[in-house]
């Protein structure tokens, strides 16, 4: 698989660290952010092929981060995979349905995460 630049955004330290390690072992260049504010800072400094982000975080939540990415890069926003234990909550379920972006229900297994990442990076090329 080609090397891609991925940003992992999650306020859960252990999960974020595991995801970063697994994605690096898969050959990707990976940065991480503890929340949406830090993620926006990193997104302002460099471009990413994929953002793997939690839906619920302190400060800027996943939906707000997604909207900011779309506004900053309307011609080529990064691909996104959402993660959450709250995908059944109506506001998040509606948001996920509207965006059409994939979501991983926490807790998820790492093999499933790796498969979704592979699918998003290889089967959904952005122009």
Regions found by a protein language model. Give the residues of each.
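Charged docking surfaces used in two-component/phosphorelay signaling
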Residues: 17-25
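Hydrophobic/aromatic residues positioned on beta-strands within the core alpha/beta folds
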Residues: 81-84
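Acidic, metal-coordinating helix/loop segments flanking the phosphotransfer/catalytic sites
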Residues: 7, 32-50
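C-terminal output helix
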Residues: 108-117, 125
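Receiver (REC) domain active-site loop signature in two-component systems and cognate sites
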Residues: 57
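Active-site residues of response regulator receiver
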Residues: 54
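His-Asp phosphorelay/catalytic-motif detector in bacterial-type signaling
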Residues: 47-49, 73-79
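Acidic catalytic/metal-coordinating carboxylates
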Residues: 35-38, 61-67
